[in-house]
């Protein structure tokens, strides 16, 4: 058996930790050749790998492939072709020749990273952690917890720095309402449930066990889901079917003070309605994704007291890279010991 991994710089621009981890995993199984090309080196697989006819297992990470490559790798049993946009035509040609083509069956490799980030955004939004962090760099006012004179019930008090106009404090006891029950949404639901949140989710494509395992009650009506939300998190991919799924009518039905968490794709929501209500201090927002990216430096959402914002980096951890590699390796046939 001859195992080869090739890596193109274009792939590593998106997944800088994946190739080396995949290499380590295959090294644990036996000999493996690892070919990392330099920027500008766009040789195809059959030009890059010596004696291609003897290769039996191949992972191509961004390396170009052509129909000539399909012919050249005559001894190939399994192949994984990976780049930013995929190579479906070449993959089909390998499959038609009897080669097992291996790829990801889902984007679960970054599920844990994005779900943890969603939890962090929710906690930051509830407690205004980023705002307080930033303000005390240049202002002592946040340290002053002096109440109003006379003190007002439900007002500022000793070490109470939350904004009572919005949902605040602990996630325990909050009504978390999630759109989605997939790899990210179900994990986020489970985390919040473990911390004491009352979790309900809507996803017409998910099976009942998806909700049960996540500690979420299944809601069958979006209108009912949004109406009871302390925290609202639409966590679904952006497709033709889901774009604008959360309409202005649904956004307007969110209770005043609700915290909206955006961590997958913003445009599943009517973002004009989200912006309108956030800028009117009717909703709080904790978001890693936006309708416009990058956000212009003068965007009205930036720096607001009721907005937590980060630059779309929830999913790309080292662990997500390593999981990307591990899930590919798991799909190859076991190597005889």
Where are these regions (language model features)?
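N-terminal glycine-/charge-rich "phosphate-binding" loop or analogous flexible N-terminal tail
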Residues: 1-57
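Short acidic-hydrophobic, aromatic-tinged amphipathic segments that line or gate anion-handling sites
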Residues: 36-39, 102, 217-221
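C-terminal helix-to-coil terminal segments
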Residues: 2, 7-27, 104-114, 125, ...
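Glycine-rich, N-terminal phosphate-binding loop of Rossmann-like dinucleotide-binding domains
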Residues: 62, 83, 234-236, 264, ...
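Glycine-rich adenosine-cofactor-binding loop
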Residues: 9, 145, 149, 159-193
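Phosphate/diphosphate ligand-binding glycine-rich loop within oxidoreductases
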Residues: 56-150
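Rossmann-like adenosine-cofactor binding region
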Residues: 66-67, 204-300
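Conserved beta-strand positions in the Rossmann-like core of class I SAM-dependent methyltransferases
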Residues: 200
């Amino acid at each position: 058996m001859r195992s080869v991994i090739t890596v193109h710089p274009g792939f590593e621009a998106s997944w800088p930790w994946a190739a080396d981890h995949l290499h380590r995993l295959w090294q644990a199984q036996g000999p493996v050749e690892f070919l990392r090309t330099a920027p500008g080196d766009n040789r195809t697989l059959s030009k890059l790998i010596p004696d291609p006819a003897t290769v039996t297992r191949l992972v191509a990470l961004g390396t170009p492939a052509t129909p000539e490559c399909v012919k050249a790798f005559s001894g190939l049993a399994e192949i994984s072709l990976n780049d930013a946009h995929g190579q479906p035509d070449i993959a089909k040609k390998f499959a038609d020749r009897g080669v097992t083509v291996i790829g990801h069956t889902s984007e679960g490799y970054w599920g844990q990273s994005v779900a943890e980030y969603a939890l962090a955004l929710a906690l930051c939004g509830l407690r205004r952690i980023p705002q307080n962090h930033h303000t005390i760099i240049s202002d002592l006012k946040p340290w002053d917890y002096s109440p109003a004179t006379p003190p007002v019930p439900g007002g500022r008090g000793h070490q109470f720095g939350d904004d009572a106009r919005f949902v605040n404090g602990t996630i325990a006891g909050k009504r978390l309402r999630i759109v989605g029950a997939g790899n990210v949404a179900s994990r986020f639901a489970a985390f919040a449930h473990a911390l004491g949140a009352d979790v309900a989710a809507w996803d017409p494509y998910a099976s009942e066990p998806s909700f049960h395992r996540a500690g979420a009650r299944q809601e069958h009506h979006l209108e009912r889901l949004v109406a009871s939300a302390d925290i609202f998190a639409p966590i679904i991919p952006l497709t033709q079917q889901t774009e604008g799924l959360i309409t202005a009518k649904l956004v307007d039905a969110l209770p005043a003070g609700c915290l909206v968490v955006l961590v997958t794709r913003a445009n599943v929501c009517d973002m004009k309605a989200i912006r309108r209500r956030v800028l009117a201090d009717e909703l709080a927002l904790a978001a890693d994704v936006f309708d416009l990216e990058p956000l212009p430096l003068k965007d009205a959402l930036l720096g607001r007291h009721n907005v937590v914002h980060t630059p779309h980096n929830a999913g790309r951890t080292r662990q997500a890279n390593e999981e990307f590699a591990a899930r590919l390796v798991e799909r190859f046939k076991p190597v005889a010991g």
